[in-house]
Amino acid sequence: MDGTIKEALSVVSDDQSLFDSAYGASSHLSKADMTASANPDYGQPHKINPIPPQQDWINQPMRVNIKREYEHMNGSRESPVDCSINKCSKLIGGSEGNAMTYTYMDEKNGPPPPNMTTNERRVIVPADPALWSQDHVRQWLEWAIKEYGLVEIDCSLFQNIDGKELCKMSKEDFLRSTSIYNTEVLLSHLNYLRDSSSSLGYNTQAHTDQSSRLTAKEDPSYEAVRRSGWGNSMSSPVTKSPPMGGTQNVNKSGDQQRSQPDPYQILGPTSSRLANPGSGQIQLWQFLLELLSDSSNASCITWEGTNGEFKMTDPDEVARRWGERKSKPNMNYDKLSRALRYYYDKSIMTKVHGKRYAYKFDFHGIAQALQPHPTDTSMYKYPSEFSYMPSYHSHQQKVNFVPSHPSSMPVTSSGFFGATSPYWNSPSANIYPNPNVPRHPNTHVQSHLGGFY
């Protein structure tokens, strides 16, 4: 009876161990003792207890315990899975906008197993190798040695080399310091970093060294050069010449001069057209425009801008040339300036106040002066061309032209001169024997006009 109960308990205990994962290694010893005290007819105890499945069931809880013990020992709650051992983690970010983070192990007592976490060291360098300092180059070499397992590299040969010099080194320069295998690895990774920084649009001017920044910012035109993108070198503060497509100039005064158009190109054709007097005689203002239309006369007269203002740089020479044109050898600037005042009232030109020998053309006034004015044709017409004037002697017709008094002046047949003059053949004769002369109706011109003569 006692043997049957023990056998049943042994079977139940063994079945529970298959499904209950809370049973640990300490419970197996008691189970084995219970089985050993049972009837030996059931065979060996290890054949009844499924020990291999129990090992599989308890494997995972043991791993969790290992992680927790590690966290407790180091005082950190970071999971060891977050740390990479075999490969470096490259991160873009950090304190600077573009930086690479390299992670490698500190080997103290030999290389650790690949499934265990060790203390790691991070190296943060700029993304562009050309901006590396000497310390960055050294850290990069140390990382490459740890990462790729490189040997036979003398780091002392790279002590005084910064990022610029490193990028300029050729394959032969690397071969002088290390083997061909190490050279291929280092150059491949260096080229990869350079290509990555260029694809990210990395701005090399933003990370120049402090000395070059101070030197460049002392010049006030540095900002204009940097913003316009004309700075081709990181160390040179000012470029000598901007590109063809540039829209800003380094020198502000030069920018203003280049922005103003050439007055001779703008006012030259207008000056030549207005200076042409045609068939008539040339006037003084036209002569001045003739001189201003040619830039070779700038030694004596020149434009001041494009608004019509000009200045006589040599007024005596201008007066002498005007005297030669008009055949007046005694011409001087005083006489010429008095002649110019005549054009003030005609709105052809004005005197620029505050400037000596400076005048200004009024092209609107010149256009008004050159327009043909409509003349009164009545001043040039004969009286016979008007409908209300019948003859050349209008004063005789006005004597009897009284619209308010329809009755005519009573006269005798003998006329004003008494007896008939022998010069007149008939009383009806008049001074206009031609019948084609236009006459007004009889109400205005009486038929007795012939009796007056």
From Swiss-Prot:
Q: Which Pfam family, an example, fits this chain?
A: Ets
> In what ranges is there compositional bias, type Basic and acidic residues?
215-226
Gene Ontology terms, MF aspect: DNA-binding transcription factor activity, RNA polymerase II-specific; sequence-specific DNA binding
Q: Which Gene3D superfamilies match?
A: Transcription Factor, Ets-1, Winged helix-like DNA-binding domain superfamily/Winged helix DNA-binding domain
Ranges of Polar residues compositional bias?
201-214, 230-239, 246-273
- Asked whether the keyword 4Fe-4S is assigned, the reply is no
GO BP annotations of the record are: cell differentiation; regulation of transcription by RNA polymerase II
Which gene underlies this protein?
A: fli1
The record's subcellular locations are: Nucleus
Location (main, coarse): nucleus
| Name of the protein | Retroviral integration site protein Fli-1 homolog
- State any GO CC term: nucleus
**DNA-binding region(s) from the entry:** 282-362
Q: Which SUPFAM superfamilies match?
A: SAM/Pointed domain (SSF47769), Winged helix' DNA-binding domain (SSF46785)
Q: What protein family is recorded? A: Belongs to the ETS family.
State the SMART domains in the record: ETS (SM00413), SAM_PNT (SM00251)
- UniProt region (Disordered), positions on chain: 201-273
**Where do the PNT domain residues begin and end?**
111-197
Q: Print the keywords alphabetically.
A: Activator, DNA-binding, Nucleus, Transcription, Transcription regulation
Q: What superkingdom does the record give?
A: Eukaryota
Query: Is this entry keyworded Metal-binding?
Result: no
Taxonomy, top ranks, is: Eukaryota, Metazoa, Chordata, Craniata, Vertebrata
PANTHER family per record: ETS, FRIEND LEUKEMIA INTEGRATION 1 TRANSCRIPTION FACTOR
